[in-house]
A protein has these predicted regions:
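The feature marks cytosolic C-terminal regulatory regions of anion transporters and related permeases
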Residues: 1-144, 163-166
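Short acidic-hydrophobic, aromatic-tinged amphipathic segments that line or gate anion-handling sites
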Residues: 145-161
């Protein structure tokens, strides 16, 4: 009887751990974000993950805020989302302020996003980059894609650079 209780509880713990891990990976792979929309020097609104389907092209500048981490697991989701919905605008600000972690695969995805946007003649700014992220960016062989003018301290600076009166 003691052996059966021990085996059953171990199986239950393993099954629970596997289910929790699957839930975590599924949630993590979605790539958390929010989008701030601006038109004619004015803030329009902020869309969160659940509101993404309400997105329209009635704005001039889009601020795409990465949240959490940017890694291999969720990088493609961010890239696809930007390609599908954000790509229609001329000016895109990639806000990294709430990005807690970015690995080398996440950096590669970031460079792919920038390459794709610049190839389509979009004006791209990157804001909120930490010192650790800057070091990671400068050590990469694609660091030539990011110029000093593109990387600004905060989103307000980027909006001023574009011509917004803030």
């Amino acid at each position: 009887v003691v052996l059966m209780v021990g085996i059953d509880s171990v199986v239950g713990l393993l099954a629970g751990t596997v289910l929790a891990l699957l839930y975590f990976v599924e949630n993590f792979s979605k790539g958390h974000f929010d989008i701030t929309r601006n038109r004619g020097n004015q803030f329009i609104d902020r869309l969160y993950e659940g509101d993404f389907e309400k997105f329209s092209d009635s704005v001039d500048v889009v601020v795409y805020s990465f949240k959490g981490s940017l890694t291999y697991v969720n990088g493609e989701t961010h890239k696809d989302r930007i390609h599908e919905k954000i790509n229609m605008f001329n000016t895109i600000i990639l806000r990294m302020r709430e990005l807690g972690h970015m690995d080398h695969d996440g950096l590669e995805i970031l460079y792919e996003i920038i390459e794709e946007l610049e190839h389509e003649k979009k004006q791209v700014y990157i804001t909120g980059v930490t010192e650790d992220m800057k070091i990671l960016m400068l050590k990469n062989d694609k660091s030539h894609l990011i110029t000093e003018k593109m990387v600004l301290e905060n989103t307000t600076s980027a909006l001023r650079e574009i011509g917004f009166i803030i």
